[in-house]
């Protein structure tokens, strides 16, 4: 999957994993990146899947920082 822009408001991407532990490991790694960037995505975690949702809360929309964070999450 790739990132999608939803309603011109936020970025979304889904990842698939072989099990819950792998999905959790990815989410934890993503959280470390979010903390380092001081820009925090919303995550939905389930068995073998993770969804990330990114937008800038201050403007209730997208900024360059959202795309930078998305690119960094792609490198995990």
Each language-model region and where it sits:
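Long, contiguous binding/interaction regions
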Residues: 1-14, 18-24, 28-76
């Amino acid at each position: 999957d790739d990132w999608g822009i939803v309603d011109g408001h936020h970025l979304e991407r889904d990842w698939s994993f072989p099990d819950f532990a792998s999905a959790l490991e990815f989410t934890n790694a993503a959280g470390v990146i979010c903390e380092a960037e001081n820009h925090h995505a919303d995550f939905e975690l389930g068995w073998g899947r993770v969804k990330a949702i990114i937008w800038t809360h201050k403007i209730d929309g997208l900024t360059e920082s959202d795309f930078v964070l998305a690119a960094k999450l792609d490198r995990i």
